[in-house]
Amino acid sequence: MIFSNKNNEPLQCFNVSIGGVTIDRVESERFLGVILESNLTWKTHISGLATKISRNAGILFKLKGLVPENVLKIVYNSLIQSHLYYCSNVWGLGSKSSINKIFTAQKKSVRAIENRFNNAFYNSETGELPCHTKEIFSRNSLLTVHNIIAKNSLVAMHKIRLNTAPMKICSLFNVNNNINYNSRRDPEFFNIPGSRLKALDKTLCIKGPRLYNKVVNELNKEHTSSLNVERMFLNPFKNRITCYLKSSQDDGNIDWAVQKFPLYTV
């Protein structure tokens, strides 16, 4: 596999051989549970993940009505949520539309975690649409895939700020340790590097610092804690971020289309 973000003609003709045997070139390959592509768009991984979640949602529908709701939620956490959390700050930092397939599959599975009647499918005879899922997410304290990606990204950035992440990863970021809290401007906890490529803007190196600076400043302005958020230990920080994301997720009407997810406001 040759990584490139362009359809470069010389690269298409480039072959590698060992001992006279040409190595087969592939466009995508699974590595540590994540499907890598030669152009690093993550489309293959996202499509495969959406299919897997949709298939696992079928298991939830078969269990619905047979087991208590707490068991359904355990199954959801095992078969759905675990896949959404895994490396989501790697494959999920693209545009909102790029993960629509996954969000659709997640909403399908969420409709099955309550034993009450939730219309899960479109009725072609009556024209009835599937029920809205925003209240189901709220009742069960679940994060959408957009906010799961945001949470994982913020936690990763906080580990880097606390210098508890691996050194090689920490070296990729520029932590600002000289913060003037008396300034009228919002402090920047990470210095954001310049970028000429749109593809780079959709990586943790660029989007991570932007998201962290914005969210942490918003939380510090709420003054709900005597300790600034950026100075918290990891577990209190995770809890604070989860509450913030759930609160922002529950705001507004039931229409997800107009939902302003923090991940896409930076």
Question: How would you describe each model-predicted region?
Answer:
Residues 23-26, 66-75, 131, 140-149, ...:
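Structural motif
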Residues 85-99, 205-266:
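Charged boundary/loop elements
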Residues 131, 167-207:
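Amphipathic alpha-helical
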Residues 20-90:
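Basic, alpha-helical interaction scaffolds
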Residues 79-94, 115-116, 148-165, 210-215:
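Extended, well-ordered alpha-helical segments in internal regulatory regions
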Residues 1-27:
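Short, conserved micro-motifs composed of acidic
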Residues 1, 100-174:
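Short, charged alpha-helical motifs in flexible N/C-terminal segments and linkers
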